[in-house]
Curated annotation (Swiss-Prot):
This is Alpha-conotoxin-like Qc1.5. Alpha-conotoxins act on postsynaptic membranes, they bind to the nicotinic acetylcholine receptors (nAChR) and thus inhibit them. Signal peptide: none annotated. Residues 1-21 form a propeptide. Disulfide bonds join 23-29, 24-37. Belongs to the conotoxin A superfamily.
Amino acid sequence: SDGRNAAADDKASDLIGLAVRGCCSNPACSVNHPELCGRRR
C-alpha cells in the first residue's frame, strides 16, 4: 500500500472526526445526524 495515501486518509478521518464532534456538541446538528453521534432511534 502507498504510505502517502494512508497519511492522507488519516488526515481526512481526523478532519471528519473533528466535524462529527462539533456536530454532536451542537443539538441542532446532532438531531439531524443521529447516526454520527451514536444516537440510534
